[in-house]
């Protein structure tokens, strides 16, 4: 009688699925091939950068400028060697012709050849060093020697970490920035054993960061 008065009806027991929300924590994980550590092979002082964690970067854009006296010295050494190489090549060709006509001794010719080859090796090695700091040896001249060099973004992606500040000297082995290519990004989530049965491959997940909880990202368990 009381059930009727309360307008409550009863029926047979049924097995129903009840939805629930499971909140779990984790961290963003990226395959090694999608992570890039940016360093300066010859070291130097960080002159400028605008990078912050989370910023988007485009491949080829300037992400930092470095400054050091050794950059000037390297450019000077290359241009000096290049100039000496030009005359060494001329002298080598001259001594070669003289030697063929027996107007010059083998010793003089061989010395000219050795000098030319040595300078050619030195020039090539210095040119490769210039490429390491993003200076094109083919366009370098006495008119555009600079104590500053740019660092360019090697990938399209996001800044994961900034490990340096303006004015700091960085060694060749130091990492300035860590970048992420998000094309294969995934979440590494930690789940309690009692909750494992609540999850399944293909299940949809809604993810967000503590810094930006309003920005939700649709994910899927794989």
Feature locations, PLM:
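Acidic, gly/proline-rich low-complexity N-terminal segments at the extreme N terminus
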Residues: 1-24, 132-153, 207
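Flexible glycine-/small-residue-rich
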Residues: 28-30, 153, 181, 189-193, ...
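Elongated periplasmic alpha-helical coiled-coil
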Residues: 41, 129-168, 183-185
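Low-complexity, intrinsically disordered
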Residues: 165, 182, 201-218
């Amino acid at each position: 009688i009381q059930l009727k008065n309360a307008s409550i009806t009863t029926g047979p027991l049924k097995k129903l699925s009840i939805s629930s929300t499971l909140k779990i924590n984790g961290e963003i994980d990226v395959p090694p091939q999608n992570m890039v550590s940016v360093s300066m092979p010859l070291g130097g002082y960080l002159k400028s950068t605008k990078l912050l964690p989370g910023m988007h970067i485009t491949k080829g854009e300037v992400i930092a400028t470095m400054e050091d006296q050794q950059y000037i010295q390297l450019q000077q050494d290359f241009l000096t060697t290049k100039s000496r190489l030009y005359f060494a090549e001329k002298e080598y060709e001259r001594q070669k012709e003289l030697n063929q006509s027996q107007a010059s001794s083998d010793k003089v010719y061989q010395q000219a050849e050795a000098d030319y080859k040595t300078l050619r090796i030195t020039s090539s090695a210095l040119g490769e060093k210039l490429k390491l700091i993003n200076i094109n040896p083919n366009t370098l001249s006495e008119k555009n020697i600079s104590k500053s060099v740019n660092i360019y973004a090697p990938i399209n992606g996001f800044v994961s970490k900034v490990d340096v500040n303006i004015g700091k000297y960085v060694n060749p082995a130091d990492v300035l920035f860590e970048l992420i290519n998000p094309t294969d990004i995934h979440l590494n989530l930690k789940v309690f054993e009692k909750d494992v049965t609540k999850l399944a491959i293909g299940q949809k997940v809604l993810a967000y960061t503590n810094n930006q909880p309003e920005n939700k990202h649709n994910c899927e368990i794989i």
